[in-house]
Amino acid sequence: MKRFLDRRTILAVAVLILAPLLWFAPVILGGKTLIPADNLYQFQPWASLAGQYGVGVPHNELLSDLVLENFVWKSFLREAISTGQLPLWNPHLFTGVPFLAAGQHSALYPLSIVFYILPLPLAYGVFTWLQLAVAALGMYVFGRALRLGRAASAFAGLAYAFSGFFVVSVVFTMIIAAAAWLPWLLACIETIVRKQEEKGDVAYSPIPYVLGGAVVLGLQALAGHPEIVVITLLVAGFYSLLRLLVLWRRIGALGRAARLAGWLLVLVVIGIALGAIQIVPLF
């Protein structure tokens, strides 16, 4: 416990949480928003009012999905929740379409609570900050699981959270929400295998780490971007195979490696089951 509560660890965690806050301070603290509202003026009826309101060329017309879809989804969710309704059906498109089953609105994702309690222009900034912090902390934990030093792990966390992928995806909330959990899952896998390496041919129960990894995978499934879940499972599968082969070579016990492989499959099954409330209706 002392290892996780010393001052250097607390400092590293604080930096990883505050760095995204500093980056998005104009949105969270300065009254700005990530919602590209100016993109609406490319379309009627708003285009007819562009001159009247002094709206010129949009800052980035490729980001229209956020204001045309995601913002509308979040508004519909808030409306449904305020009236005590479960938003199973969207009556506003043609004769109506399934809504909750669609998934990309992230309605069931725990951190989406910020969209239900904060004004939407502010909520997008707060949500993005929290997700980048989750991503940074996850990579820090993965680095520590690999026995990297605190500084190296913190640098890895910053590099991941501020990577090109996250930077260009900040306006796609479901993408960053899902991708943020990848290093947490890898950290669970690494811990499960490394503990067996430390114990050699002596059996141990990895249940706490299996359950932790399952929760991580379930959260990722609820985030609303199944493509990221598929990519995560591929990465986790290849990483698990590599680590199990290394484990077999180091301790020379094929049975122990096979046993851990079974536990990792249990992790995936439980994780998918936790996210099934969103996955099953989607398909």
Over which residues does each language-model region extend?
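Helix-boundary and loop/linker segments of multi-pass membrane transporters
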Residues: 5, 202-206, 253-257
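Membrane-interface coil-to-helix junctions
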Residues: 20-139, 158-180
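Start-transfer (signal-anchor) and selected internal transmembrane alpha helices
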Residues: 1-26, 40-49, 259-264, 268
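Short loop/turn hinge sites at secondary-structure boundaries
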Residues: 30-31, 84, 195-200, 248-252
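Membrane-interface starts of transmembrane alpha-helices
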Residues: 7-11, 115, 119-127, 148-156, ...
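Short secondary-structure boundary segments
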Residues: 3-4, 98-104, 220-230
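Membrane-embedded helix bundles of polyisoprenyl
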Residues: 16, 134-146, 150-196, 201, ...
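Transmembrane helix-loop junctions and nearby membrane-interface residues
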Residues: 24-31, 117, 244-248, 279, ...
